[in-house]
Design a protein with these regions (language model features):
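C-terminal peripheral helix-coil segments that are non-catalytic and often amphipathic
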Residues: 1-16, 149, 186-226
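Basic, helix-initiating cap at the start of DNA-binding domains
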Residues: 1-38, 45-46
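Hydrophobic/aromatic residues within well-ordered alpha-helical segments
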Residues: 23, 65, 72, 76-80, ...
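Helix-turn-helix
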Residues: 26, 30, 34-67, 71
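Hydrophobic alpha-helical connector segments
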Residues: 71, 82-115, 166-169
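Secondary-structure edge/capping motif, primarily at the C-terminal ends of alpha-helices
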Residues: 87, 116-120, 176, 180-183
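Short, well-structured alpha-helical segments
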Residues: 99, 144-148, 162-170, 190, ...
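Short secondary-structure transition hinges
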Residues: 110-144, 151-160, 164
Length: 226
């Protein structure tokens, strides 16, 4: 009889932990909005109320500002990774995968300004660098797999290096955090990411792939508009 009781306790603890994580992510989303408006150095109760937060709530769910920032960046990665978890891309055309990811990025990150991330990188550089490395590793692997899939499907050029293209993409993506290249008031993460995807596809596709990309991009644009 001990094992069922232990199982129930373990299950309850697991559900409680997941609930707490979801709550922290919800708060992190609101914190990003707060930081974009008021910065990270001063948490004013009146300003917090405007984004649906309170000082008491923050103290209950976060140990300090580092914990807040770490959760904000973790949630950003989680939202990105969920796209690949929600879609089963097995058997899909490589170009369609790129377009689906671009559309989902646009839907989920349409209002995410690089200005917040730039602020976080300046105040907590070590936390930010850890985030950047984890995000880069994830995107690199997905990009590399896609390029190799597209080559096998006859959509991408056979003489491209999947590793080199993936690394170049990561380098350009990380330029998002350089305000001299992308002024944060003029660009969102989604806009920059999708433009980079567009440039990559145009550079690595062969004639058949370019024709397919043009056709499918128009289709996805119509579906997304609806």
């Amino acid at each position: 009889m001990k094992y069922p009781i232990l199982f129930i306790i373990f299950t309850a603890e697991k559900e409680f932990t997941l609930t707490m994580i979801k709550k922290r992510y919800l708060l992190a989303d609101k914190l990003r909005t707060y930081i974009s408006r008021y910065g990270i150095n001063n948490f004013n109760e009146e300003h917090l109320k405007k984004v649906g937060l309170s000082i008491e709530e923050l103290k209950e769910n976060f140990s300090d500002r580092q914990d807040m920032v770490g959760t904000i960046l973790e949630y950003e990665r989680k939202c990105f990774e969920e796209i690949f978890n929600e879609y089963n891309f097995e058997g899909w055309n490589a170009i369609d995968i790129m377009l689906i990811v671009s559309n989902e990025i646009n839907n989920r990150f349409f209002n995410v300004s690089p200005s917040v991330t730039i602020t976080l990188s300046e105040v907590f550089p070590e936390i930010f660098q850890d985030h950047l490395q984890k995000r880069s590793d994830f995107i690199y692997e997905k990009m590399k797999i896609n390029i190799e899939k597209g080559m096998q499907q006859g959509m991408y050029k056979n003489d491209v290096s999947s590793e080199m293209i993936a690394r170049m993409f990561i380098a350009k993506l990380n330029d998002i955090h350089n305000p001299q290249i992308y002024p944060p008031e003029d660009f969102t993460f989604a806009t920059i990411f999708n433009n980079l995807i567009d440039n990559v596809i145009k550079n690595i596709t062969n004639e058949e792939g370019r024709a397919y990309y043009k056709q499918r991009k128009q289709l996805y644009s119509v579906l997304n508009y609806r």
